[in-house]
Amino acid sequence: MAWNSFATPLIGKAVRAASRLAHGGGSAFPGKIVERIDPQFLARTLQQLPLGVVLVSGTNGKTTTTRMVASMLESLGLKVFTNPTGSNFTRGVVSSLLAEVSLGGKLDADIAVLELDEAYAVHFVKQVQPDYCLLLNVMRDQLDRFGEIDNTAKLLSKAAEATTGTVVLNREDPRIARLADVTHTEDGVEVRYFGLDKSLRSFFPSDDDMCTTVDTESAADTEASVGIDLSESAESDENIEIGDASAIAKTGEHAEKSENAESAEQLPADVTLLAVGDHRASFGIDGETYETGVKLEGVYNLYNAAAALAA
């Protein structure tokens, strides 16, 4: 066994202890140091796990969904390693590993459930191919980081492509659902979907749905402030100007979003959120309906629960 199999945990734990004394809490700094001195530590340690690695990523809901998946697996009697306090960058995962491994580099766990930032998921899968991958959504929350929303989807596609076992996708998010195209189903990779009952879709708008709402409200505001009925000007091809061309483009976008909704209907969801109530929810799983109490606050966390159940 290489010397760093013993030296890295010792050095990393020492740095972690010093960092906790200095800052009084969890820190990704020890992970950064270990990545420098032993780039193979992450892959070497996670390869010990008999049941492999579950990767969870997406714009929103990563932390809650990761905790739910880990909790479900623990309820089955499995020992689960996760990154609850570290950052969701690769160095955060390494820092969390340093807290769990023995001085000999042994990780006492059956499976890992890891939350990864969209950008760092790409770096992670270059080192460790996940056995399972759960991709939640792509939203415009972080355009300052990724520029275009499609860039975020491209980052997540790398995680889906690298997965060797099962990829779980959000049926309601067209950018996520399309990632089935990059999975290696010819090599036995399974694709599963979680989704919403049609009656609930208005309560869980996708990024495209929210943009549609903004566009509609903007058009209404323009119509009211300028005093022009935009629907009348759209009836005459002779009156088309630059502003009308933009409106026509938006009409095409809305038609595409309608097609996306129809496509979602056609995809078979392995887990469907059927109904929500006061701390209760109904899920459709493999054709059966299950109603359960839910302690989590927030309606979106019920949809995250559907994602966790599908994993």
Model segments located where?
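Short, basic phosphate-binding NTP loop
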Residues: M1-S57, M72-L76, T90-V101
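Short gly/ser/thr-rich secondary-structure transition/capping motifs
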Residues: E35-Q40, S95, V113-D117, D150-N151, ...
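Conserved glycine(s) of the Walker
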Residues: G61
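A conserved segment at the C-terminal end of the G1
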Residues: T64-T82
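Short amphipathic alpha-helical face segments that pack within enzyme cores
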Residues: M68, G92-S95, A306-A310
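Active-site nucleophile and cofactor-binding loops and adjacent substrate-binding regions
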Residues: T82-F89
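Flexible active-site lid/hinge loop adjacent to a nucleotide/diphosphate
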Residues: G104-T212, G293-K295
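Adenine nucleotide phosphate-binding catalytic loops in nucleotide-utilizing enzymes
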Residues: G188-A311
